[in-house]
From Swiss-Prot:
InterPro entries: NqrA, NQRA_2nd, NqrA_C_domain, NQRA_N, Single_hybrid_motif
GO BP terms: sodium ion transport
Enzyme class, UniProt record, top EC level: translocase
Swiss-Prot/TrEMBL catalytic activity: a ubiquinone + n Na(+)(in) + NADH + H(+) = a ubiquinol + n Na(+)(out) + NAD(+)
Gene Ontology terms, MF aspect: oxidoreductase activity, acting on NAD(P)H, quinone or similar compound as acceptor
Gene3D superfamilies linked to this entry: 2.40.50.100
Annotated family: Belongs to the NqrA family.
Name of protein: Na(+)-translocating NADH-quinone reductase subunit A
Disulphide connectivity of cysteines: none
Keyword line: Ion transport, NAD, Sodium, Sodium transport, Translocase, Transport, Ubiquinone
Subunit structure: Composed of six subunits; NqrA, NqrB, NqrC, NqrD, NqrE and NqrF.
Gene giving rise to this polypeptide: nqrA
Amino acid sequence: MITIKKGLDIPISGAPEQVIYEAPAVHHVALLGEEFPGLKPTMLVKVGDHVKKGQPLFENKKNPGVIFTAPASGLVTEIHRGHQRVFQALVIAQDPTIGAVSFQRYQDEELPQLSREQVQQQLLNSGMWTALRTRPYSKSPVPGSVPKAIFVTAMDTNPLAASAELIIEQQPVAFVNGLTLLSRLTDGKVYVCKGENSLPHSHVANVEERVFTGPHPAGLAGTHIHFTEPASAKKTLWHINYQDVIAIGHLFASGELYNERIVSLAGPGVSAPRLVRTQLGACLSELTRNQLLAGEQRIISGSVLSGNKAAEVHDYLGRFHLQVSVLPEGREKVFLGWIMPGQDKFSVTRSFMGHLSNVKRLVFTTAKNGSERAMVPIGNYEKIMPLDILPTLLLRDLAAGDTDSAQQLGCLELDEEDLALCTFVCPGKTEYGPLLRKCLTKIELEG
């Protein structure tokens, strides 16, 4: 067992009831480009085409062979592009009568005998290959490549997250089958990183469990990788979340793409926080209709720490997101608020009286409580960073664009979500995730 001592569990109100409900039906789904850094799609469909679930929509020309398939059957209604024609979203109006693409089916006892090439090809053909991400760089793996190890994130310590154990218990056979299939993709270990609760266990020799406890970010893939088998420029690892492992198990058992998602619909802006059963890429404005409290609310695909604002062309559940978080827009001005004791406010530095209050959960809003300013190294980053790195020095190098020093300080191990807590506690209001991505892109291109 690895116990994480540094970190932070944010006392945010609106925690979900850990019971799974059926979500309202959604009529539109989409694939979003922002989740795949450097994506350059070669389109295989156009607006007005009818597509089956699992049908190829586009291929990544920067990573040939990586196919993105339709998460549902229906009509392609929109293809959005942004500045310099950067791909943003492909939207499908659902029509279940069109049907689905069929893939090869296997019996459970056949899975351990499948070759690496068979497993890879089925994942590529179905689009499930995109569920895998590399460290470093957090990109889809190159087809034919072999990782040193694969990490399965079977826990979630994000604020307002769903219980991974509860969801895995719904599909134990598919989860174990998914682990068996992942074990065929590497000569190293498949690490199932989990909390203290028991999970369905795989008997494949190279599948091992690792137990992590402690505050957030104890449940992040970056934390698991750092304390188990760190990544580097010469050592590539893959990671995947537990619901995608279940989806892989279903794909090989049924021969059909499985895009069900159980997500946490929660936060201070939700009237009845709970777990809901929906689908990958679901339209969030449709999913949250009549589910929110009065007032202006911000819908976030993902965690309140590292998720994306769901609005306009981005109004859809992200490929890797297992949460829909809702926060009130913090536009109200408080008269003389800067000198108030702040009994209803949270502060890592205990600048407010909130830490003396009996209120255990606080209503957080989107307000940053101040404009951007210079980095102030007062020890905040060190309080919440459990990884064996020097956070203040690393963040300074990211802000300065010093890629050589950032590499020496461990930036190749990290993803945007690993620095989300640093952004939250930063007195200077700096967003470190985009700075890290800019640095990683430069390193990948220039070394």
